[in-house]
Amino acid sequence: MKTRCFCLAAFSGILTTLAIPNEIKETGYSILGFVAYVPLFIALNKLEDKKALMGLTVFYFIIANSLQNFWLGFFHAFGWITFIGVIIGYIPYSLTLGYFLYYSLKSFKNKTMSITMLFTFYDYSRSIGFLAYPWGLAAFTVNNFNNLIQIADIFGVFFVSFAVYFLNSGIADFLIHKNKTNLLNIAFPTLLITASFTYGMIKKIELKNLLAKEIDSLNIAAIQLNTDPWLPGNDKKGIRDSIEITEQALKENPKIEFVIWSEGVLTYPFSKEDQHFKSSDLHNELKNFIKEHKIPFAIGAPSNLDKAIGIQQNSIYMVEPNLNITNIYSKIFLVPFAEKIPFYEYKFVRNFFLKNFRILGQIEGNKIEILKLKKFKFAPLICYDDAFPELSRFYKTQGANILVNFSNDSWSKTNSAEWQHFVVAKFRSIENGIKTIRATNSGITATINEYGETIKKLETFKKGYLLSTVKLSPTFTTIYEKIGDSFIHILVMMFLITTLRFQFMEDKNQLLSSSVVKIKV
């Protein structure tokens, strides 16, 4: 029995990997999202031993996380540390999930809902805190069903995860028991999925006229470099190539009003070139290029560099044609075990990473910056920032009307990594009802509309430029913008109340039983 259950869990690990963007199909097989967790949930329902159930839960996530995040192993010289760190770092999370699953499945009658709620909590829990890594959420397994995921503008991405888990858990329960009562466990989640699809279709009809209006427009060039400037010897090449590609874009459209270069194009702070850069001539060429074309640039470069203690911030500079820097935004969310290195405050740890991997540690930014141009108010997000719904939502509440993501995922060397990141960006547009522009080093450079649909994009791992006349439509307030992840908080409260109520009833029954025994005696 145990061997069969572990095989089922491994099968789910493969199915969930195929459902999201992967190396076989870049967009993923989203149809699998509706059944990918079924083998796992059947196995969880079958196991009655506590250690076996907890072990199965950990085993599944090791399989799934390894298959879905293998590209972390390519993260520069210490990718293996990043990959192993992420896999091992989430074992305590899956152990905790397994622990709660055991007692919930043992105690509660509605196993379908118990599994659904606990797996949704798992998705949320690994999206917060020091080890936050919100990748591979259940919601992403159905990302190609655009009408379905529109419901994220009400309850957020975790509600979509809930719906996916609910359907999978219902199917698993029905396949185990196969009776009319358990048919309801499929009926309710199917109704929820159908209602979400219907909402998405109606939403697009209702917003069509509003989004057809135009308040302002802006000609934008997003430059895709396809060279990692942070690799040895690539720093100068990165600048030269970026200038060359930008010149090509300006030849095609001389009316460009805003140029966006990706994350980390410069390997030195833009405002301190003489102190940090070996070739001031090349940097002067860049400055003259900006002044000559009289166009504002957004450029990825480090800031607050301190080589003495080995730290810097990953930043975006908003540079005016006269070279004034109007904004410097620094990345707020850092990747655990890659940018956010445990114990980096100790000198021997800093020296180890600097000596062996030529890596400077990063410190988080602590404030948002809105880049203003005409009537556009851009919300800059650097790479991993866009994986956190609360940041994009906060930008929107502060008046931002378009998201712009600067990313360098070229180190991943895989299409699956680029497309997985792209899926994340789609949800931020849906949740907040605003467009997203992605300017990336190697993919996916694109413009995304308010529904999370791709307007234009470039191919991955190819040099190029994306020219877009971005239309600014009237903004509208989404329910998610107002309530955030309240759905999760309500779900947690419901689970706690149910658990406490069950515990109270158990204690009451035990008390009554002991009283009956005493009376008989």
Swiss-Prot record:
Name of the top EC class for this enzyme: transferase
Gene Ontology cellular component terms for the protein in this record: plasma membrane
Keyword flag Acyltransferase: yes
Membrane-protein topology: Multi-pass membrane protein
Keywords in alphabetical order: Acyltransferase, Cell inner membrane, Cell membrane, Membrane, Transferase, Transmembrane, Transmembrane helix
Catalytic-site annotation from UniProt: 263, 331, 383
Pfam families: CN_hydrolase, LNT_N
Secretion signal span: none
Record GO terms (molecular function): N-acyltransferase activity
Subcellular location: Cell inner membrane
Pathway stated in the Swiss-Prot or TrEMBL entry: Protein modification; lipoprotein biosynthesis (N-acyl transfer)
Domain annotation CN hydrolase: ranges: 218-472
GO biological process, one term: lipoprotein biosynthetic process
Listed transmembrane segments: 24-44, 71-91, 128-148, 151-171, 182-202
The EC number(s) this enzyme carries: 2.3.1.269
InterPro entries: Apolipo_AcylTrfase, C-N_Hydrolase, C-N_Hydrolase_sf, LNT_N
Function: Catalyzes the phospholipid dependent N-acylation of the N-terminal cysteine of apolipoprotein, the last step in lipoprotein maturation.
Record NCBIfam families: lnt (TIGR00546)
HAMAP family in the cross-refs: Lnt
UniProt record similarity statement: Belongs to the CN hydrolase family. Apolipoprotein N-acyltransferase subfamily.
Name of the protein described by the UniProt record: Apolipoprotein N-acyltransferase
Lineage of origin: Bacteria, Pseudomonadati, Spirochaetota, Spirochaetia, Spirochaetales
